[in-house]
């Protein structure tokens, strides 16, 4: 009886194309979509078990699968066993303080977590009746974020930017700021990014004493596309357990959501699907929706997600970042132009947005000051062409004054960050929201027009401004 059962759940490899493996099963024993299959192989005298995920039914008892590990050493005819379940990961308090891969294997302590409760990474989003909209602001202590693009507690927040403008540094900054003050559980998903950054993050979290409350799940750049496509779901599953079973508010950090889309594109091509716009997979919106719809707040508990989104060639019309926009509550756009001025974080205040920058949510005073800052910066941007052609002296007196004020505003939106302390030698500063609103209100009204521009550069609040101004021979 046992041998018969084994025959019904075992198949043979018939074709291998990179990470795509076709497997033939006996009639009537074809595994379901998303089932995990195991194949034992020996390569260079090392034995290992490959995990394959069923992606397509080809007919004639054939299934097309995606390998979660490199397929070196896999040959035709190797026996493949159907586990009968989809990929699952360990969940619960035991995952905190440890690093896992997309399959739920512990990387810092091999074998750890095998006896934990496991949840499938393929889960349905909460029913509509259980969802709870959130409008509470999540204070970060970063002036530019809190004033102009306030984050929603229990919302989806994204940091957009091209290569090298500071997305990962800002994600690390948010982990430092929010996780330290948050007191809850954090889950970090490293999706297709550099292994070095993952190691740096581990060390930083340990130094900040928040590692004990953080679970890390990594599928890095050197992993096959199947792993990079599934690692975000693995991390999200761990976060869902804390939300649904332990009734906790959870922070979910994803770096980088573009790599999730990119991995889906690679897999789609290998599966033989017709490419869509710019070569992306035709199922791009569906795949993004399946992930984002699960990141949500339910009654009394929430998942607050912060996602870094790489923008290919700084093109915001690219389908990958464009598809992400639709799911977000707040967007922080990092600009190469702002970065080139040495203003950090390099947030573009005119392109960033938030659904809760509304007087009914943040209050009339906050909204009024934010709109005045945006008005001045927008007018300054409109005047740039005239200044470039005719020079600043040709402007009306009112516009000259506005330009000087806008330049001070730009510099005051910069801030020394905790994640950059080792480079700048300056401790990171946290500015309470009330002080941020007061300082920018005074600045827009011209109360600081007599101070040199340099006094506003890379500082925190009003106390820092007073010290910097004094060091430059001026007084508030």
From Swiss-Prot:
Its EC number is 7.1.2.2. Belongs to the ATPase alpha/beta chains family. GO terms for cellular component: plasma membrane; proton-transporting ATP synthase complex. It is an enzyme of class 7 (translocase). ATP binds at residues 161-168. It is found in: Cell membrane. It catalyses: ATP + H2O + 4 H(+)(in) = ADP + phosphate + 5 H(+)(out). Pfam families: ATP-synt_ab, ATP-synt_ab_N, ATP-synt_VA_C. It is a peripheral membrane protein. This is ATP synthase subunit beta. SUPFAM superfamilies: C-terminal domain of alpha and beta subunits of F1 ATP synthase (SSF47917), N-terminal domain of alpha and beta subunits of F1 ATP synthase (SSF50615), P-loop containing nucleoside triphosphate hydrolases (SSF52540). It comes from the Bacteria. It comes from Mycolicibacterium gilvum (strain PYR-GCK) (Mycobacterium gilvum (strain PYR-GCK)). GO terms for molecular function: ATP binding; ATP hydrolysis activity; proton-transporting ATP synthase activity, rotational mechanism. F-type ATPases have 2 components, CF(1) - the catalytic core - and CF(0) - the membrane proton channel. CF(1) has five subunits: alpha(3), beta(3), gamma(1), delta(1), epsilon(1). CF(0) has three main subunits: a(1), b(2) and c(9-12). The alpha and beta chains form an alternating ring which encloses part of the gamma chain. CF(1) is attached to CF(0) by a central stalk formed by the gamma and epsilon chains, while a peripheral stalk is formed by the delta and b chains. The keyword Nucleus does not apply. CDD domains: ATP-synt_F1_beta_C (cd18110), ATP-synt_F1_beta_N (cd18115), F1-ATPase_beta_CD (cd01133). Keywords: ATP synthesis, ATP-binding, Cell membrane, CF(1), Hydrogen ion transport, Ion transport, Membrane, Nucleotide-binding, Translocase, Transport. NCBIfam families: atpD. Produces ATP from ADP in the presence of a proton gradient across the membrane. The catalytic sites are hosted primarily by the beta subunits. The lineage of its organism: Bacteria, Bacillati, Actinomycetota, Actinomycetes, Mycobacteriales.
């Amino acid at each position: 009886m046992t041998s018969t059962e084994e025959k019904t759940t075992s198949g043979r490899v018939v074709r291998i194309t990179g990470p795509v493996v076709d497997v033939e099963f006996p009639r009537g024993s074809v595994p379901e979509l998303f089932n995990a299959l195991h194949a034992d192989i020996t390569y260079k005298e090392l034995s290992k078990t490959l995990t394959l995920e069923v992606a397509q039914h080809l007919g004639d008892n054939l299934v097309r699968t995606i390998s979660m590990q490199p397929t070196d050493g896999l040959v035709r005819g190797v026996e493949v066993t159907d586990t009968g379940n989809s990929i699952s990961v360990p969940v619960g308090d035991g995952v905190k303080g440890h690093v896992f891969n997309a399959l739920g294997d512990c990387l810092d302590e091999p074998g750890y977590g095998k006896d934990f409760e496991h949840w499938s990474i393929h889960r349905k989003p909460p029913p509509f009746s259980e969802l709870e909209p959130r409008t509470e602001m999540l204070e970060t202590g970063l002036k530019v974020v809190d004033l102009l693009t306030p984050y929603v507690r229990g919302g989806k927040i994204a940091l957009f930017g091209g290569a090298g403008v500071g997305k990962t540094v800002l994600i690390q900054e948010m982990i430092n700021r929010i996780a330290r003050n948050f007191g809850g559980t954090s889950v970090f998903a490293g999706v297709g990014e550099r292994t070095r950054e993952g190691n740096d993050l581990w060390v930083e979290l340990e130094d900040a004493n928040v590692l004990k409350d953080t679970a890390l799940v990594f599928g890095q750049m050197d992993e096959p596309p199947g792993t990079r496509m599934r690692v975000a779901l693995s991390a999200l599953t761990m976060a869902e357990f804390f939300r649904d079973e332990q009734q906790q508010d959870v922070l979910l950090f994803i770096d980088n959501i573009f790599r999730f889309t990119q991995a889906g594109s690679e897999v789609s091509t290998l599966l033989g699907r017709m490419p869509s716009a710019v070569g992306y997979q035709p199922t791009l919106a569906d795949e993004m929706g399946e992930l984002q719809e699960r990141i949500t707040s339910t009654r009394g508990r929430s998942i607050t997600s912060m996602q870094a989104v790489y923008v290919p060639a700084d093109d915001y019309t690219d389908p990958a970042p464009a598809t992400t926009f639709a799911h977000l509550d707040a967007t922080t756009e990092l600009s190469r132009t702002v970065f080139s001025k040495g203003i950090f974080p390099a947030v573009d205040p005119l392109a960033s947005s938030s659904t809760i920058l509304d007087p009914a949510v943040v209050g009339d005073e906050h909204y009024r000051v934010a709109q005045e800052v945006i008005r001045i910066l927008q007018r300054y941007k409109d005047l740039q062409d005239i200044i470039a052609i005719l020079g600043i002296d040709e402007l009306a007196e009112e516009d000259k004054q506005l330009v000087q004020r806008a330049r001070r505003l730009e510099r005051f939106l910069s801030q020394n960050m905790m994640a950059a302390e080792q480079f700048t030698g300056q401790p990171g500063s946290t500015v309470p929201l009330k002080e941020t609103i007061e300082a920018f209100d005074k600045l827009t009204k011209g109360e600081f027009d007599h101070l040199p521009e340099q006094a506003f550069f890379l500082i925190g609040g009003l106390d820092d401004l007073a010290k910097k101004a004094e060091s430059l021979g001026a007084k508030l």
